[in-house]
Amino acid sequence: TEGPGVVSIRIAGLRLDRLHARPGQFFQWRFLNRWWTAHPFSLSEAPDGSSFRITVKALGDDSAALSRVPIGTRVIAEGPFGVFTDAMRRGRKRLLIAGGIGITPVRALVEHLADDVVVYRAIRADELVLRGELDALGVDVHYVVGDHGVPGGDRLLSPEHLIELVPDLADRDVYVCGPPGMIDFAVKNVRAAGVHRRHIHVERFAL
């Protein structure tokens, strides 16, 4: 497991390299032991051609059941989907903003680029998923933990706070993934901090 209610699953198969999956993309997954409905999950590790890894938080009965999926379960994967990839980058440097389990595609994206900065937002420290891996990769990560409802909490991820964390923010491409409300909040504030709309890339798992 990767944290409370969070589990990583590795899916192996033949000729997976032919799918040309890229870090930051997602698939629609069907686990045939019980799931006939597809669920979108991002790759949480850069694909190596022989396996994929996803990291899932228990947000409902289906995702909670993934922690009990037997080894050897057959899987149907449709994809890859999404443009939350390095190909969208217009400049040399990136800021990647993640909220909660939205860290999964960000974790896959940051394996090879030294100029990346990550801002990882959570209400509580135990909601920070894959923190050990991010630290082991040597990524420049700012963990922003706290509730907007407490005194001083309204400053978290404000334009001023973002510029304080990343002084060259306006010169970076910004990638955002997380809950819908957090995405909208972050996009509004990075725009206010001087980032052009064309340099903002969002993953909403839309098909």
Residue ranges and their predicted role:
Residues 53, 58-207:
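FNR/FR-type flavoprotein reductase catalytic core
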Residues 1-49, 53-58, 96:
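Non-transmembrane accessory domains of multi-pass membrane transporters/channels
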